[in-house]
């Protein structure tokens, strides 16, 4: 059995890779591992379980709930809610464990399981490894320790979760959104009820699209991975801005009043300046990944804000933030973490904070986002090469050094081995697109020559 946990939980095609048996087994294993770690010591354990609206979530939820209850864990079933809502409720309700069933921005046939520890933070890698180990042992014959009688877990629906989460979101806003007209695209996903309710309570006039989930249409031509519908709707309705989420609403992208995209880097830049103005940007520092556009780094330096870089993945951003006490971080893809108010990327919170900045300043989102200029970026995938030698090849190091000399301070090069495929990703940013394409093409040839 290969490693089940990826960078964002366990994912796969529902009922093929991710079966009811696997969901049940992992849930029992998680309960045993947390009990073993002392998480449940001295009290009866409780878990919060939520899901996005994809059809497979119904049977997977049943499997997870059965697994937890059979291991003696009481379950609060919160139904269809965003991933950050499950994380928030895990902390707010004092639960020992949170479980979210979602494959985020993936297509409908996929699904996933993500576990949260007490307080609403993602499980540490070592706990995920231990869960896999306990689950594997059981598959090869090791028996579960099963409670009986009053020791089994009890299950109840917790219908107050949505209202509790929305109240939290609106309660942390620095100002209201009165006077703003906003288009929301909910990707027919987990925020289809939450996000419109939160924006309406905050005072915005709303046009909502992609908010009629039927279990099959999640992320289908809408949401943060397909912005064309949102762009058209913003222009058609004369809105001030548009906000798009993905299937589990842990990310947010935006559209300005002209229909132009505002990506995660630009959102981070706008929020960084707003938070510094409120003295909420601790250490005047923002955290982002190596995939952030160089224009973001240059803009932050120009504004006197320190930029800390991590590996790709919001979990690495979060680790850096927690270790050093930073308040803001995120990714170009729209995962934005505002650590004073959320334990993970929260698309609805991000959208609300962005809209609040527009309302507070009276400036357009286009004007606010112009604080950074996105440099042209070219990404080339080079397949069928020995990706393990990316950092050790002298020939490749020479080619990269030559490219960096050519680009100077207004460009950069990043070579990144894929985590799942035998390929290397070549990313080049430059002052103009033609130079970026030229340098990327030459570097791709060098990768083939050196690693092929």
Swiss-Prot record:
Post-translational modification: Activated by phosphorylation.
Any one Gene Ontology cellular component term annotated for this protein: cytosol
Free-text remark on how the cofactor is bound: Binds 1 Mg(2+) ion per subunit.
Residues reported to bind Mg(2+): 104, 246, 248, 250
Catalysed transformations (reactions): alpha-D-glucosamine 1-phosphate = D-glucosamine 6-phosphate
EC number: 5.4.2.10
GO molecular function: magnesium ion binding; phosphoglucosamine mutase activity; phosphomannomutase activity
Location of Phosphoserine modifications: 104
Active-site residue numbers: 104
Domain of life: Bacteria
Catalytic EC class: isomerase
Record family assignment: Belongs to the phosphohexose mutase family.
Family matches, as PANTHER family: PHOSPHOGLUCOMUTASE (ALPHA-D-GLUCOSE-1,6-BISPHOSPHATE-DEPENDENT), PHOSPHOHEXOSE MUTASE
Task of the protein: Catalyzes the conversion of glucosamine-6-phosphate to glucosamine-1-phosphate.
Name recorded for this polypeptide: Phosphoglucosamine mutase
Species of the source: Streptomyces coelicolor (strain ATCC BAA-471 / A3(2) / M145)
Protein encoded by which gene: glmM
């Amino acid at each position: 059995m290969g490693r089940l946990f990826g960078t964002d939980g366990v994912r796969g095609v529902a009922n093929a890779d991710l079966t009811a048996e696997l969901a049940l087994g992992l849930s029992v294993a998680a309960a045993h591992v947390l009990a073993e770690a002392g998480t449940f010591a001295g009290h009866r354990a409780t878990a919060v379980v939520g899901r996005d609206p994809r059809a497979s979530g119904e049977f997977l939820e049943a499997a997870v709930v059965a697994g937890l209850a059979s291991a003696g864990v009481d379950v609060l079933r919160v139904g269809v809610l965003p991933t950050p809502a499950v994380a928030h409720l895990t902390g707010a309700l004092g639960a020992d464990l949170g479980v979210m069933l979602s494959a985020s921005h993936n297509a409908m046939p996929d699904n996933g399981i993500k576990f949260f520890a007490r307080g609403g933070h993602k499980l540490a890698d070592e706990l995920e490894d231990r869960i896999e180990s306990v689950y594997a042992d059981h598959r090869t014959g090791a028996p579960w320790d099963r409670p009986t009688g009053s020791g089994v877990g009890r299950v109840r629906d917790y219908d107050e979760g949505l209202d509790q989460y929305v109240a939290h979101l609106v309660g942390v806003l620095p100002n209201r959104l009165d006077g703003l007209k906003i288009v929301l695209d909910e990707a027919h996903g987990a925020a289809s009820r939450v996000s419109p309710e939160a924006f309406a309570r905050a005072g915005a006039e709303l046009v909502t699209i992609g908010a009629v989930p039927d279990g099959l249409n999640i992320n289908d031509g809408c949401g943060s991975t397909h912005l064309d519908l949102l762009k058209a709707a913003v222009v058609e309705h004369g809105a001030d801005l548009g906000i798009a989420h993905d299937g589990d609403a842990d990310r947010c992208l935006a559209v300005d009043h002209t229909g132009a995209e505002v990506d995660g880097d630009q959102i981070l830049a706008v929020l960084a300046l707003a938070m510094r103005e409120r003295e909420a940007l601790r250490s005047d520092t923002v955290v982002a990944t190596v995939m952030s556009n160089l224009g973001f780094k240059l803009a932050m330096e120009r504004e006197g804000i320190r930029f800390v870089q991590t590996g790709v993945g919001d979990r690495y951003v979060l680790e850096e933030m927690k270790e050093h006490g930073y308040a803001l971080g995120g990714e170009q893809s729209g995962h934005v973490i505002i650590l004073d108010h959320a334990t993970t990327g929260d698309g609805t919170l991000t959208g609300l904070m962005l809209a609040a900045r527009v309302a507070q300043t009276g400036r357009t989102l286009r004007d606010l986002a112009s604080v950074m200029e996105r440099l042209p970026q070219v990404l080339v995938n080079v397949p069928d090469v020995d990706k393990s030698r990316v950092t050790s090849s002298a020939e490749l190091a020479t080619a990269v050094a030559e490219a960096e000399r050519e680009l100077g301070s207004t460009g950069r090069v990043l070579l990144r081995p894929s985590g799942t495929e035998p390929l290397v990703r070549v990313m080049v940013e430059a002052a103009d697109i033609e130079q970026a394409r030229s340098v990327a093409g030459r570097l791709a040839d060098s990768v083939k020559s050196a690693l092929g």
